[in-house]
Design a protein with these regions (language model features):
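Aspartate-rich (DDxxD/NDxxD/DxxxD) Mg2+/diphosphate-binding motifs
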Residues: 4-12
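Long, contiguous internal "core" modules enriched in hydrophobic/ aromatic residues
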Residues: 11-190, 194-200, 217
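C-terminal nuclease/phosphodiesterase catalytic domains that cleave nucleic-acid phosphodiester bonds
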Residues: 203-206, 224
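Central hydrophobic cores of alpha-helical transmembrane segments
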Residues: 206-216
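Membrane-proximal extracellular juxtamembrane segment immediately upstream
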Residues: 219-226
Length: 226
């Protein structure tokens, strides 16, 4: 009921808290995107070149994006009471899923604009982005496979039991999340299969479906799956 109390995080900073750094990087990224977006759109509106200084903010925002998902991963990995979150690759998983789902959503919006307004982003934009998505999704699935190996090969119940519950339920009783998790697995594997084959990845009819499945899979993994 009093959102102004959020300012207390900055008026009384606590650098030993991960939440303080999370709020800092999120606010910084919001300001960067607001300035970059507003300046670029204003230049587009008046049909002029954007100022040269905006380029340096764009470069800064690229590196800043890494900090957002890294700190978010630290929020989870820093809680020793949750074995499923207590993993060194949690931040890397957040980065990989962000670099595949974020560009995937961007490409889907571009395809929607193309269909509704006739705006064509061109192959010079679509092809590199789809390749980045492919690599990031491959890394994302690989990191989750590392989690599975560590959990089940070690035989530590605290690591394996949460995964068993997510996919199989508990003591023979299905959980509501089981169907969602298997859907995420099917969609993730199917989307990566379509993206790995250049003939499918460069097909503008097939690519959107692969991106939709990828986005749903990563959303389930980073929401219901955590």
């Amino acid at each position: 009921g009093q959102p102004q109390r959020v300012l207390n995080m900055f008026l009384h900073p606590t650098p030993n808290s991960v939440m303080f750094w999370d709020a800092t990087v999120l606010l910084g990224y919001l300001i960067l995107n607001a300035v970059i977006g507003w300046t670029t759109l204003e230049a587009e509106r008046y049909d002029v070149e954007p100022p040269k200084w905006i380029k340096y903010l764009v470069y800064l925002s690229i590196f800043w994006a890494f900090s957002i998902h890294t700190v978010t991963g630290f929020l989870y990995a820093g809680l020793p009471g949750r074995h499923y979150w207590l993993t060194a690759v949690m931040a890397a998983r957040f980065l990989a899923s962000a670099f595949c789902s974020g560009p995937a959503l961007l490409l889907l919006l571009l395809f929607m604009l193309k269909r509704l307004t006739g705006f064509n982003p061109g192959k010079a934009v679509v092809r590199p982005l789809s390749l980045i998505i492919t690599y990031a999704m491959g890394i994302n699935i690989f990191l989750y496979c590392l989690e599975l190996f560590t959990a089940f090969y070690s035989g530590i119940p605290g690591h394996s039991d949460p995964i068993v519950f997510l996919f199989m339920g508990h003591e023979g009783v299905d959980a509501w999340v089981n169907g969602w998790m298997w859907t995420a697995v099917v969609f993730a594997c199917a989307s990566l299969f379509l993206l790995l084959i250049p003939r499918f990845r460069t097909n503008d009819r097939i690519l959107p479906w692969a991106l939709i499945m990828l986005f749903i899979a990563t959303w389930i993994d980073k929401s219901l799956g955590l």
